[in-house]
Every structure is written in C-alpha cells, then in structure tokens.
C-alpha cells in the first residue's frame, strides 16, 4: 500500500495529532503501544476474527439492489449490508476490537459516548460479552430521541449517564466521557465510537472498521470481475465511511464519496456539514474541521439523524479532501427521509436515517452513470431505531 497515514505523531497532513492533558498522555501512549503490538499478535488476531465471524455474523452480504438500480436508471447499486451485523450497525466491528484490546491491557471497565445510541448499545454488548463494567454518556436530547436504545443499554448491564451540559448532544457526551476517563484512567478504557479523538483512536477505529471495505472489495471483484467505479457512505464522525474507503485508497479508479447531513439546508444554521462549512480547529484531542463561529466557539450540529450531528469530522477525511482523494457532499433531512422510504419500498429494507443520507446521494450519482458502471453504498445500519421518529414526522406532515 503506497498511501501511509498517520505519521508517527498521529497526523494526517495537518489534521489529527494528540492534544490531550498530561493526565491522559500516558494512557494514549500505552494504548498506542498495545494496539501496535496487537496487530502482529496472531493469537489476538485469531480471537478478533473468531468474534467477528461467530458473534457479529460477518462477513456481511454485498447485495445487488436491483429495484433501486432500476429506479435510479444508471449504474448498478450494491449495498454493503452492515445493517445485518449483530446489534444492527457497523459500530460493533470497532467495539469488539477495542474490548479485546482493553482486556489485553488488563482494564476491566469501559466508558463510551453515544449519539444515536448505536455505539452505546455496541459497547454495552461487548462489555456484557467480556464481563466488563460499562458506563455510557449520552446527551439529554439524544436520551429523549433514542429512549429505546437507552433501555437496551440498561438491559445489557450498562450505566447510562444523561448529559445536561451544553447542547445536550453527542459533543457534550464526548466531553463528559473524556472527563470520566481522566478520573478513572488506571482501570478504564475509553472505547471511542468514531474516527475521532487523539491519536491513536482515529487509526484504531479506521483499522477495525476496514473489514467493511476489505470484504466489499473482494465481494465486488467476485460479482463483477472488476472494482466498483464509486463507493458511497454517510459521514458524521466518519467511521463507516473510513471503513469502506480505506481499503480502496490506492485504487485510483474508484471514486470515493462521503455524504454529510445538510439538516434544514447549508444556508441555514441547522446542519452538520462540517467538511462543507467547517474551519480547522481542535476538538476532543485532535486537529480537525469543526463547525465554529467567528470567535472559535463550537457550534451546534443539527440533523434529523442523531448519529450524524457531530460538529467535527475524522481528521483522515479532511486529509482525503485536501488530497483530492475523496469528495464530500451533503443531503438534507427531507432528502434523507425520501431515500429512507424509497429503500423500504423498492428493496424491502428499512435503513437507518444515517445510511439514508448515503442512499439519497447514491441514487443521484447512479442516475448520472452508465449501466455498465457500478457502485458500492455502505448501508451502515438498520432503521428500527428511527421508525418512531419517522412516524411522528410523517404524521405531522399529513396533519399540517
């Protein structure tokens, strides 16, 4: 592989790095050492692969969406079915790996942040599996939006802490989880949920999620005899996208498209389009594109989908954009809801609202491509968690 990042200081070009208090520096360095060692440890890799296959249910299918393709009227659309994983999303690819890493480091407790609740559920799941004590921080707004996932986490034995500070969403949950980690660093591992945070987290999460792209690349070659012409994924922090993109990074013929949440529209204040509208800053221990005002205060991100409303983006995505290796687009709430319904009706698949952003852009892109071309879209999660929210929204529209 010719592309190599991060450098030894955890930078992807000018993005990334390690901006943490002294109290955490020892912990992130210890984590980095343990992680690098685990990569060449056959016993660790064997155990990881065992749980991915037998517990998570990998590999996931690469499904030819025939009716969706016909609807778009262009390139063949293949769906990488991460919604079929145990717990219903891509998040568990990463939590399994990090829980095994925590165990290797002798840490019996884990802490995590969650927005939509998917990462919280995936963390609580592996904590139950490996008999670890688990604390999850979740913004008060998200606790309301995703009450079912809160109950799921509690069923799995986790303690869910509702965060009432700031905008009471994902950003604030990360702040509190980091504070908790600082106070309990000796016996606790922080399971970061996306390609964010101080080095080595973006690298660790990318590598554990790369199973998505590794499988998709192999499966597409088997089905089509060539690589896809384009790959598409939604981007909040950006872990499902990075998991799909990274194994294709040296395949210059494969266009990579990340899709952010445009909320009510980029011209409004209600969006989460960090790459389109952000400026470079430091958030949660790394240099990244951040939504901020002229005084450098972090703005609230907004999206119908709780998993996309993060005001930053993984540093490697910003690096890909600067290199011209990936293009980033945005899709509004209304477009995502339309795509959600479209996939339900054409393929009988209920996607997560996060993934619906990718579907929306993919259909537009496919329609401009030739029938002999093909694309892979990451269906990052299933939509059970969103059905209630959607029901209220659609009923609200019919009652207006």
From Swiss-Prot:
Question: Which pathway does the database say it acts in?
Answer: Amino-acid biosynthesis; L-tryptophan biosynthesis; L-tryptophan from chorismate: step 5/5
Cofactor(s) needed, names only, are: pyridoxal 5'-phosphate
Q: Superkingdom of this entry's organism?
A: Bacteria
Pfam families to which the protein is assigned, alphabetical? PALP (PF00291)
Q: What are the recorded Gene Ontology BP terms? A: L-tryptophan biosynthetic process
N6-(pyridoxal phosphate)lysine, modified sites: 91
| Catalyzed reaction equations | (1S,2R)-1-C-(indol-3-yl)glycerol 3-phosphate + L-serine = D-glyceraldehyde 3-phosphate + L-tryptophan + H2O
The record's keywords, sorted A to Z, are:
Amino-acid biosynthesis, Aromatic amino acid biosynthesis, Lyase, Pyridoxal phosphate, Tryptophan biosynthesis
Tell me the protein family, please: Belongs to the TrpB family.
- Its biological purpose: The beta subunit is responsible for the synthesis of L-tryptophan from indole and L-serine.
This protein is called Tryptophan synthase beta chain
Species in which this protein is naturally found: Listeria monocytogenes serovar 1/2a (strain ATCC BAA-679 / EGD-e)
């Amino acid at each position: 592989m010719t592309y190599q990042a991060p450098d030894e200081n955890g930078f992807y070009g000018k993005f990334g790095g390690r901006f943490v208090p002294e109290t955490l520096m020892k912990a992130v360095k210890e984590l980095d050492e343990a992680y690098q060692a685990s990569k060449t440890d056959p016993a660790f890799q064997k155990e990881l692969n065992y749980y991915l296959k037998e517990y998570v249910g990998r590999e996931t299918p690469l499904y030819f969406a025939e009716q969706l393709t016909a609807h778009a009227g262009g390139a063949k659309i293949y769906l990488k079915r991460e919604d079929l994983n145990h717990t219903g999303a891509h998040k568990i690819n990463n939590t399994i790996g990090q829980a095994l890493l925590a165990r290797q480091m002798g840490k019996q407790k884990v802490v995590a942040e969650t927005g939509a609740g998917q990462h919280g559920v995936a963390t609580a799941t592996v904590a139950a599996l490996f008999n670890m004590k688990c604390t999850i921080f979740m913004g008060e707004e998200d606790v309301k939006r995703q009450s079912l996932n809160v109950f799921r986490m509690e069923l799995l034995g986790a303690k869910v802490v509702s965060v009432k500070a700031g905008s009471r969403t994902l950003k604030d949950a990360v702040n509190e989880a980091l504070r908790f980690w600082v106070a309990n660093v000796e016996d606790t591992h922080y399971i970061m949920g996306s390609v964010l945070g101080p080095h080595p987290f973006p690298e660790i999460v990318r590598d554990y999620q790369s199973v998505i792209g590794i499988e998709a690349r192999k499966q597409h070659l088997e089905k089509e005899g060539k690589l896809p012409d384009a790959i598409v994924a939604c981007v909040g922090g950006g872990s499902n996208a990075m998991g799909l993109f990274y194994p294709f990074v040296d395949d210059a013929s494969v266009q990579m498209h990340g899709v952010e949440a445009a909320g009510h529209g980029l011209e409004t204040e209600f969006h989460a389009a960090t790459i389109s509208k952000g400026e470079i800053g430091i958030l949660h221990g790394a240099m990244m594109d951040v939504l901020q005002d002229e005084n450098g205060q972090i703005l609230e991100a907004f999206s119908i989908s709780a998993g996309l409303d993060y005001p930053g983006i993984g540093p490697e995505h910003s690096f890909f954009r600067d290199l011209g290796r990936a293009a980033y687009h945005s899709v509004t709430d209304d477009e995502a809801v339309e795509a959600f319904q479209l996939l339900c009706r054409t393929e009988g698949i209920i996607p997560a609202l996060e993934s619906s952003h990718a579907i929306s852009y993919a259909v537009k892109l496919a329609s401009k491509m030739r029938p002999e071309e093909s694309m892979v879209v990451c269906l990052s999660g299933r939509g059970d968690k969103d059905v209630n929210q959607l029901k209220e929204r659609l009923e609200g529209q019919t009652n207006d």
